[in-house]
C-alpha cells in the first residue's frame, strides 16, 4: 500500500505526490488522517511527476501540506445488500443515523461498467401510480426511467414523495433513495414519512445534501445506484429515486472548474453529456431484475432548453413536466398535460381506450389554449355554441386533473386519494362525452375519482 504526501490544497481539490513507481490509478480512493477524522480523496487526474489531483469527499478544513496519504488501491466501496435497508448512509456508505454499524456482508465499488447490450431487457408492463394525470397522460413503464421536470417551488419533491408513498406501499419491493444536493430538512421529513408509513425497512437512504463539498454530491448518486444494482442483480424489481439529478450535474460543473477544465455552454463542464451517460446507462433493467427510476430534474429559470435538463431528456422513457402557470391556478399536481410525454402512450401498450382518452383530453385542452386569446379580447359570448362546450369541458378536465396527495395532508387538510387507472379513464371519458356537462366545474377540483365529483356537486 503506497504512501504519498499532500503538496497542495485548493478548496476541495487536493494534490498528492507519490513515488513515481506507485502512482494511484484514476478513481482510486486515497485516505488521509485529518485530525480525528479520516478523509477520503478520489483521484481525478494524473499530472505527471508522481503527482495526482484528487477531489475530497468531505470537508478539507484542517488539511495541510506534508500530511501522509494512503493509497487504498481500489475505488470507493460501499455496503450493498439487505443490511442497507432502513439505514441512512453518506457517500462512503457510512451510517449517519446513529444506529451502529451497517454489518454488511459485501461491499461494491461505486464505479462499475453498465450492463452489456445482451443483458438488457425490454418491459412493456405499466406501473400504476394512483396519480390521475400521470397514469393518463404519461404512464410509467416497469423498469423504465422517469424524469420530473420543474423550476423552483412547483412541487418536484412533493410529487416524488407521493410517488414513493404510492409505489413503495402498493409495490412490495425494495427502494433506494439518493438525495443529491437537496435540503437536509426534506431528507429528514422523508425519513419520518417512511417510518410513519412502515416502509422504512424496505428503503435504503443515501444522502449527500446541499452543505456537502462538490466531490460528495458528484458521487452520492453513484453510491445509491450501486446499492440498487445489487438488488437488481439478485433478481428483484427495485425502485431508484434520485432527488435531484440537476445537483449531480452542478457538482460536476464545480469539480470540472476546480480541476481547471475549460467550461462549455452556459458554464457547464465540457464532459456534461458523458457524465450524464455514465450515470444513466447504469440505471437500466436486465434479464435478471429491473430498476425503475424516478428522477427529479430542477429546471434553471424554467428554461427546458438549458443544457442540463436538455441532456437529461434524451435518457428518459417518460417526462413529467411541472408548470408554474398551472401551479398559479392552484391546480396540484401542477403537471402540464400538453408538455408531458411517455413512450408507453401507445395503443399497443396501454390499449386503444386509454390512448384515445389521453389524446382526446389533449386535443380539448389544446383547443382551449387557442380559444383563450379570443376569450380575453372578445369575451365568452362571441364563441360558437360548439366552442363554448369545448371551453366548459376543458375547464372541468383541467380541474379534474388536480388531486389531493397523501404526503400533503398536513398542509391541505384534505385526505389523500389513490385513483386506479380504470377509474381515471372512466372519469375523463365521461367528461369528454358530455355525461357531466350539468355539473359545476368546482365539483371537479381536488377530488379523487369521478364519483367523488358527483357527490361533491350535490353539496354545492
From Swiss-Prot:
Enzyme superclass (EC): translocase
Positions that bind ATP: 150-157
GO CC terms, sorted: plasma membrane; proton-transporting ATP synthase complex
Membrane topology annotation: Peripheral membrane protein
CDD domains: ATP-synt_F1_beta_C, ATP-synt_F1_beta_N, F1-ATPase_beta_CD
Subcellular location: Cell inner membrane
Major place of residence: membrane
Database matches in InterPro entries: AAA+_ATPase (IPR003593), ATP-synt_VA_C (IPR055190), ATP_synth_F1_bsu (IPR005722), ATPase_a/bsu_AS (IPR020003), ATPase_alpha/beta_chains (IPR050053), ATPase_F1/V1/A1_a/bsu_N (IPR004100), ATPase_F1/V1/A1_a/bsu_N_sf (IPR036121), ATPase_F1/V1/A1_a/bsu_nucl-bd (IPR000194)
GO molecular function (one): ATP binding
Keyword list, A-Z: ATP synthesis, ATP-binding, Cell inner membrane, Cell membrane, CF(1), Hydrogen ion transport, Ion transport, Membrane, Nucleotide-binding, Translocase, Transport
EC numbers for this chain: 7.1.2.2
Subunit field text: F-type ATPases have 2 components, CF(1) - the catalytic core - and CF(0) - the membrane proton channel. CF(1) has five subunits: alpha(3), beta(3), gamma(1), delta(1), epsilon(1). CF(0) has three main subunits: a(1), b(2) and c(9-12). The alpha and beta chains form an alternating ring which encloses part of the gamma chain. CF(1) is attached to CF(0) by a central stalk formed by the gamma and epsilon chains, while a peripheral stalk is formed by the delta and b chains.
Family to which the UniProt record says this protein belongs: Belongs to the ATPase alpha/beta chains family.
UniProt function note: Produces ATP from ADP in the presence of a proton gradient across the membrane. The catalytic sites are hosted primarily by the beta subunits.
PANTHER family recorded: ATP SYNTHASE (PTHR15184), ATP SYNTHASE SUBUNIT BETA, MITOCHONDRIAL (PTHR15184:SF71)
Name used for this protein in its record: ATP synthase subunit beta
Species for this entry: Salmonella gallinarum (strain 287/91 / NCTC 13346)
